[in-house]
Amino acid sequence: MTTIAKQDKIFMKRSGAYHSELDKDIVQKAGNFPLMQFKTKVKVNPKFLLKGDDMDIVDEAITYYKANVFYKNFDMSICEADKLLVYLIFYIQSLLLKFNGRTKVECDKMAYSLAIENFALPGDGKFCLGGIVEPLKASEKEVVRQYMTAIRNETGLRLTQAVFKNDPTKCDKWWMCFNKRKFLNKTI
């Protein structure tokens, strides 16, 4: 059992933020980090593929980003899916910082390269959720890395569609006005 650091307990205080309603889509847990189904055209393990037009965790993260980015506290004990939602909000925040002043084509390329770069896995020392997520077993690491790469890639694709909805040459100002906000006073 891992101990939760004092600063991470502050994370978990009750807040009025939007929480995930998609606990039913959790397919597997790695440590205590949820791996959920999502819609994608990116290559992913079939058990993580969500069919249909229902809202998935990526839709939730993009939809709730603007509202949740203002919160300094987020209670992740309400549902397990919140851990992935918070991670995706951090990821969206890092993408928006890089999108400023670029075109859709440039942002698509940047989002893809950011998705496949080396990143901290849940339970690693540099992972953005710190002590809230348990370390992974050696057998889980490769599955989680593939899953996280696919969901980061899909999040980047959908975010560029949202940010460049009106004009492929210019970022939407209603998205970019949030790019300097720090969700939970952290970045990834």
Curated annotation (Swiss-Prot):
Q: Which UniProt keywords apply?
A: Actin-binding, Cytoplasm, Cytoskeleton
This protein's GO cellular component annotations are: Arp2/3 protein complex; cytoplasm
**Gene Ontology BP, a term:** regulation of actin filament polymerization
MF terms per GO, please?
actin binding
InterPro entries documented for this protein: ARPC3, ARPC3_sf
Q: Which SUPFAM superfamilies match?
A: Arp2/3 complex 21 kDa subunit ARPC3 (SSF69060)
Q: How does it assemble?
A: Component of the Arp2/3 complex.
The job of this chain, per UniProt, is described as:
Functions as a component of the Arp2/3 complex which is involved in regulation of actin polymerization and together with an activating nucleation-promoting factor (NPF) mediates the formation of branched actin networks.
Family, according to the entry, reads as follows: Belongs to the ARPC3 family.
Protein name (record): Actin-related protein 2/3 complex subunit 3
Natural source organism: Entamoeba histolytica (strain ATCC 30459 / HM-1:IMSS / ABRM)
